[in-house]
Amino acid sequence: MIINFKKRGSKNFINLLIFLSVGFAQQSSHQYIEYQRIQNRLQQGWNTWNTSSVLQQVLLPQGFAINLAFKQHYFLEEQYLSSALIGRRGDFTETVRPGPHAYDGSYTQLEIQWEGLDARIETAHAGKDLVILISPNSIPHDRMKVIIESGMLWNRQGHLSRKINQLKAVCPGKIIKVFTTSVPVDDDPYIDVKTPYLAVWLDGEIGISTGKKRTLLEIKKAIEIQKVSLQSEAEKFGELAEAYIAVQAGIAWNLIYEPKFDRVVSTVGRLWNEEYGGFCTFGWDNFFLAYMTGLASRDLAFSNVIEHLRGKTEQGFIPNDNRGNGSKSFDRSQPPVGGIMVKEVYKTYPEDWFLKATFDDLLGWNRWWHRSRNNEGLLSYGSSPANNPFNEPVFETKTAAGYESGMDDSPMYIGVPFNKKKHTLELQDVGLTSLYIADCRALAEMAGILKRKKEQKELES
């Protein structure tokens, strides 16, 4: 249909634009609304959302935090542990041994050792409340305090206060109270805390609860309920139940709320997040994380895929790493497993909107490989000329090409030169080419479902 705008007048033209814009908005908002619902569901309740410490529980969407810190009292020097991370190294650092961790934070358990501290810390949901149990494996020789800190994160609105033996947070639409089974001590004003807190001696088991004051017995019962629930969920995997609990824990301890883009997303490790400005996602790792979370959670699987694809470069490829400080690996990608993993997630949760939301980004990445890494008929890993605003030293080197492979300094690349004219290793990589073919087949299958005949033909040729 041809419309004569001059004949029909500017008013009709404006009305048509409004009609068309509404139509397009409805078409695109179908994906946005569905995905926003996913994020709204994920951003609820207590969990180890803050990447800065595994000893901190945060309530979303309010952003209220309960942080556990420890103060060691020596006769001369005193030490203060305000945060803890898994795998941290160095003198006088904490050692954290992670235990089970449900994706939704309904149960977590870890062991921590530091400067005489040796304890197990468990947390659990009790309805919409949180309970925490600190169980010392031994009483420290030198006296130690547990500091129960309150906090409001990410500039969320709230008012914090302490009244005798409880903490209180007043947030929009919600009041949170925090209690402890131990007797608070106020003999030490020299504590490195800038918000209301409770300090108690670590001379036995310590219980912490929100909502209402609970006894140690009540806290232990709430924890046991969630432990049993986690075990029951794992039993559907049969003889692999314990393996599933371990895999879930490994992923869940690195699941965070990422405030820069207002999202819940899996990361590879909190130490990486700390080093790279708040978060770090990796080219192929995060697609594997999406697949693994999909064994139990549709919402996490979809979120991990969609958020990872949002990190693509202007050239259309998924970078080796994507960092919270704004830096990316602008010169290199990682193995093309995205289409394969997304197809597997779709097989578990066959929702066409999910394919529509991801297909074009995956196709763009697929085309980039053929365009940028074709080395006389087969593919090779490499590192391309690119803007380097953060002055990363490895651009256009063999080292960077190794990073693109995901195998970094593998012995397979000993003696293989880097061709600076081709920007690739002088190695036609059968493994990479095979993954690329598998990616083409996965995307062709997706194109067929979406009735994208032209793209399907391209991918099958």
Go through each PLM region and give its residues:
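Internal, well-ordered alpha-helical segments in soluble enzyme and binding-protein domains
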Residues: 51-54, 358, 365
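Intrinsically disordered or highly flexible coil/loop and linker segments, enriched in small
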Residues: 22, 257-261, 375
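Terminal accessory carbohydrate-recognition/targeting modules of carbohydrate-active enzymes
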Residues: 2-4, 8, 13, 17-18, ...
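Hydrophobic alpha-helical membrane context
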Residues: 23-24, 297, 451-452
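Substrate-binding groove/exosite segments of carbohydrate-active enzymes
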Residues: 237-348, 355, 363, 428-430, ...
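The feature captures the catalytic groove of carbohydrate-active enzymes
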Residues: 198-210, 315, 319-337, 343-353, ...
